Amino acid sequence: KMSRTASEGLALVKENKGNISLIEVNCETDFVAKNKDFIDFCKELSEINFTSKGDLNKINECKMSNGNPVKDNLVNLISKIGEKITIRRANFYDNSKGINFFYVHSAIEKGIGKIISFVKLEGVLKGKNEDIGSKIAMHIAASNPLALDKDGIDKNIVDKELEIIKAEITNSGKPAEVADKISKGKISKFLNDNSLLNQIW
């Protein structure tokens, strides 16, 4: 089972006194992602993450409600369900330095879905302008930016995109000086489209 790809699964978010637990657990099929045992396991991990604060090694060693560590319960769940299951990633955000906001896309129940976006904002006041946080979180889920700003986009991704753009222009038979101008315009558009602060709102 370990050689198979676990590309389905669930993302979970839980809030406790303004602190946020985010966790992603993968399985092989959408069918298993809807399985009660799988969902219950994920929910308990989401709670455990408040203690382990996003550290996967700590999560694996934590005892669950049945008294067994997460790693043993994971092995048992894999054996019972018959699919590869992996705890892909976990994050924890405390309630200091701003207010935490999140958005759950395609929620199957509260705090559980396929995609969860998260944003922490400073200068936002509860009850005043806090709806901006929820709107930004929703925008992130819809537009999937690669980074906060242009400089944050991985150089390898930019270089690869530039390579693709140049190959397309070269194949179209445009003169070099025109090709250079077009490639600059296209890479600028790519950077704007993929950085949150430059995306169209």
Segments from the language model and where they lie:
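N-terminal assembly/interaction segments in proteins that build large macromolecular machines
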Residues: K1-W201
